[in-house]
Amino acid sequence: MKLAHLSLFLLALHLSSSRSPSASDLPQEELVDQKCLLQKYTHRSCNKVFCQPWQRCIEGTCICKLPYQCPRAGTPVCAMNGRSYPTYCHQKSFECLHPEIKFSHNGTCAAEGKFNVSLIYGRTKTEGLVQVKLVDQDERMFICKNSWSMAEANVACVDLGFPLGVRDIQGSFNISGNLHINDTECLHVHCRGVETSLAECAFTKRRTELSNGLAGVVCYKQDADFPTSLSFQCVNGKHIPQEKACNGVNDCGDQSDELCCKGCRGNASLCKSGVCIPDQYKCNGEVDCITGEDESRCEEDRQQNIPKGLARSAQGEAEIETEETEMLTPGMDNERKRIKSLLPKLSCGVKRNTHTRRKRVIGGKPANVGDYPWQVAIKDGQRITCGGIYIGGCWILTAAHCVRPSRAHSYQVWTALLDWLKPNSQLGIQTVKRVIVHEKYNGATFQNDIALIEMKMHTGKKECELPNSVPACVPWSPYLFQPNDRCIISGWGRGKDNQKVYSLRWGEVDLIGNCSQFYPDRYYEKEMQCAGTRDGSIDACKGDSGGPLVCEDINNVTYVWGIVSWGENCGKPEFPGVYTRVANYFDWISYHVGRSLVSQHNV
């Protein structure tokens, strides 16, 4: 029986260690993660994407900020209702709450005329060549076809009142024989795709010999198509060809075709979080993958002369032109990025001093000063009974089974401790103000095994001072780390052969996927995380409870991914350790400690 259990464990590790496949590795129907699709993620799902700067993340969804929550720095903008707003963020926040109030133009509302987009030469109201009239321009102008992609077409259709966006950009239109137009007279437009009006996009009048016609669009109506076995159903109800899913192009309009991918086709790259982004988003100065890899190693790539983000892709992205003339409107994308840069920034997960990374040693190794500055010990009476994790301010994260609210007065939090028989000079001792145990904690099943400890501030102080501690970051998304990622556990728990351990020790473990096969009827995947090694030599044990399972992202920022919770037969390979999955409790944590203390993004 044990042999079978061990075989299951090794198989799980093997499956976890398989590399992320490219689109060429997978049949077309297997590019999409069907289990992920059940979550119905869209461009408003902050488990998968960053919220816009006029939104904030609440319970996994990007919701509208109130205008006063926007940064004040910026220049005025005018909306289609003729009202001026202090900044672009204020207008977009107001529009988020009142979608009919769209952006018109930069500056005050003194300019003559309004921005307008219309369709002409279509056989129905849903299609035609696209014409725009810019503010302070006297005439309507067509859009050049070679600057037209799904990004621009989706924005145009939404602007025209078709919330599901575009159906096709290759329509056949009844163009009048009286239409005499030189291609050089059309406008080039560039949108990112998150805009709600073409007025927010950049318009340029260019002289070009590369134009191959005028841009047209067929907008999507709710009853436009019936689902087939070869269609992909978007979360918004739209149906697109299956081969358009996971290609880095937002064909759905709500991005749901790009958020649950195992690989990407075409000119797209796969984020570790299962999101396909266009190749030109890599190394463009803005982080698009929530896991950050699209902006890592950029300097190295530049040194190897690998151009990224310089030209737009074949899915309708603009060709490099030989001659340019005037910029008519600059677009608001740079302003969106600037607003993002003004949002509050949180410092966490970065050690003050850097030690040389040591190779993994079987059985773990003693830690040095500053190695794990978020690790704390919880002392109850005369004994250190559990570990904990400092997350900032006066707050410690630990396991619910470690503490009781009624005993808060008897606990002490020891910070920067290395050896509890030989206290080091950096040691700090904090008393406890209160203990908050998750209201749905179940001591029999270890569900919701999470608690918060609030430390007392010293007399006359307005905040807790822990000079030798650094908070670990709190993860907001369950997709920041994946099975087979190598992470670190630390603590003062029992060692080999149940020996007492007095010095802080650490060890590397691999995250494991669903552990229901090892712990039938006891493992709850949403709330729990398994981790271990092939030989069981690194494991959390008695006394480590409440301590950290931390993972580093690609930028070496440390997140508390798990809290030591439970397991069986410490150090046995067929019994991996089970940890409370912290990302599942981000909103619970932020509710008690305050969002500003733990929110890195989407604030």
From Swiss-Prot:
Any one GO biological process: innate immune response
Paired cysteines (S-S): 36-260, 46-57, 51-62, 64-96, 70-89, 78-109, 144-186, 157-219, 191-201, 234-252, 246-261, 264-276, 271-289, 283-298, 348-473, 386-402, 394-464, 487-551, 515-530, 541-570
Gene3D superfamilies in the record: 3.30.60.30, Low-density Lipoprotein Receptor (4.10.400.10), SRCR-like domain (3.10.250.10), Trypsin-like serine proteases (2.40.10.10)
Principal location class: secreted
Binding site for Ca(2+) 1: 244, 247, 249, 251, 257-258
Annotated glycosylation sites: 106, 116, 174, 182, 267, 514, 556
Catalytic reaction annotation: Inactivates complement subcomponents C3b, iC3b and C4b by proteolytic cleavage
Enzyme Commission number(s) of this protein: 3.4.21.45
Active-site residues per Swiss-Prot or TrEMBL entry: 401 (charge relay system), 449 (charge relay system), 545 (charge relay system)
Mutant phenotype after disruption: CFI-deficient mice are viable and fertile under specific pathogen-free conditions. In the absence of factor I/CFI, physiological cleavage of the alpha-chain of C3b is prevented, and reduced plasma C3, factor B, and factor H levels are observed.
SUPFAM superfamilies associated with the record: Kazal-type serine protease inhibitors, LDL receptor-like module, SRCR-like, Trypsin-like serine proteases
Signal peptide: 1-18
Residues noted as binding Ca(2+) 2 in the record, renumbered to the chain: 281, 284, 286, 288, 294-295
SRCR domain mapped to chain residues: 117-217
Pfam families tied to this protein: CFAI_FIMAC_N, Kazal_CFAI, Ldl_recept_a, SRCR, Trypsin
Domain Peptidase S1 residue range list: 361-594
Family: Belongs to the peptidase S1 family.
Subunit text: Heterodimer of a light and heavy chains; disulfide-linked. The fully processed and mature protein circulates as a zymogen, and is allosterically activated by substrate-induced remodeling of the active site. Interacts with C3b. Interacts with complement factor H.
Entry protein name: Complement factor I
